[in-house]
Amino acid sequence: SATESRNYLKMTRLEESVFFAKEMGVKKVGIAFCIGLANEAHFCAQYFKNEGLDVQSVCCKVCSVDKDLLELEKIKPGQREAMCNPKVQARLLNEGGTELNFIVGLCVGHDMLFTMESKVPVSSIITKDRVLANNPAGAVYSRYWRRKLGILEEGTV
């Protein structure tokens, strides 16, 4: 609660994450990221490092195999497509001794598997939403999306 009370409307989520880690005495953090957000993960890691934290990061495609081997559905059938591996991401960060882990854009479901496998607390820095520029709250902020989703209430803007 100190993170919220001391920094309300003053810090971004990224800054609050560092503040929280330092308040908890954390020295080593992990970042589990989606390959599609590798640049964003890089900038998050750089900020953490600039703030004195040791950072380990693991891409979602670590130790992956082609989806054909497991007869998994593909986004583009007929093309090679590596599967994601959120449990191995968590295991590698566990082995690396991270004290707090952060998610940068893992898919729905993959984020849950990662969180279940992590031995330390997990928070999200970026939540993936391919339609809304990684801003899932846009679906409830936007009148268009509220109407499309059937949640636009009479008299609301």
List where the protein language model places each region:
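Short, surface-exposed connector motifs at secondary-structure boundaries
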Residues: E23-G30, L92-E99
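Short, acidic/small-residue loops that bind anionic groups at enzyme active sites
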Residues: D54-K61, E117-N135
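A short, acidic, amphipathic alpha-helical segment used as a generic capping/interface helix at domain edges
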Residues: M83-T98, L106-G109
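C-terminal functional extensions of proteins
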Residues: S123-V157
